[in-house]
């Protein structure tokens, strides 16, 4: 289904080498995504070349800015169809990835992909604000990822509680405004985070992306994350 040369080229542009085994995993993923998307909505992007660039290459761009040690623990918050968590795992099967989502059908899709490609992953059917207070998951991860449309202060409150001190929150968006980043500064202070790097790049021509890396420098106070309604209605800051 996928164009092998296009995946190799776009991955190489992100500093990632895709071997034949990895290509097979991505091809299976794309096929399952295409077929499952006919039954319920996982993505608006279904053309193979667009999927390669706008989903796979976009997620692989994380490797340009983050050095994942072997066996690093990562939680993908609001994973949906597996972006970016499943893409990262397909490229780096040594990672220990937990897929968090509140929608069972999406997690069932993730499980089907993992089964087909022969990789292990951890499925967590929960709301982020509930799992973030659970001792099994709170401050247990080296990395948290989110590729979402929520505002940065909201994403920080959902994601930072999962990260252990010294770990990082990787926030991916098509664009953060400088105002949005400034508005998150209070949330970072409260939650124990600090901006480590702000990376803006062109995925392809006229498609600008931004990856913000937030370092966890202190423990998150036990009162956070708050209930979802409070997070949305009154973002920190």
List each model region and its residues.
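Short "lid" loop at the C-terminus of a central beta-strand within the Rossmann-like core
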Residues: 129, 174-178, 202
């Amino acid at each position: 289904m996928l164009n092998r040369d296009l995946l190799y080229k776009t991955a190489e542009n992100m500093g990632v080498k895709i071997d034949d085994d990895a290509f097979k995993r991505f091809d299976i993923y794309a096929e399952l995504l295409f077929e499952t998307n006919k039954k319920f909505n996982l993505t608006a992007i279904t053309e193979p070349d667009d999927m390669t660039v706008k989903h796979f290459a976009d997620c692989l761009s994380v490797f340009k800015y983050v050095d994942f040690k072997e066996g690093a623990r990562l939680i993908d918050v609001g994973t949906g169809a597996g972006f970016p968590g499943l893409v990262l795992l397909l490229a780096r099967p040594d990672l220990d990835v937990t897929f968090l989502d509140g929608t069972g059908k999406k997690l069932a899709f993730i499980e089907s992909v993992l089964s087909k490609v022969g990789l292990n992953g951890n499925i967590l059917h929960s709301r982020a604000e509930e799992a973030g207070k659970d001792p099994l998951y709170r401050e247990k991860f080296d990395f948290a990822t989110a590729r979402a449309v929520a505002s940065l202060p909201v994403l920080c409150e959902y994601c930072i509680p999962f990260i252990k001190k010294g770990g990082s929150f990787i926030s991916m968006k098509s664009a953060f405004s400088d105002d949005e980043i400034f508005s998150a500064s209070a949330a970072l202070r409260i939650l124990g985070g600090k901006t480590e790097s702000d990376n803006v790049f062109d995925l392809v021509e006229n498609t600008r992306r931004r990856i913000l890396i937030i370092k966890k420098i202190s423990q998150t106070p036990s009162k956070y994350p708050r209930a979802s309604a409070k997070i949305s209605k009154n973002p920190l800051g």
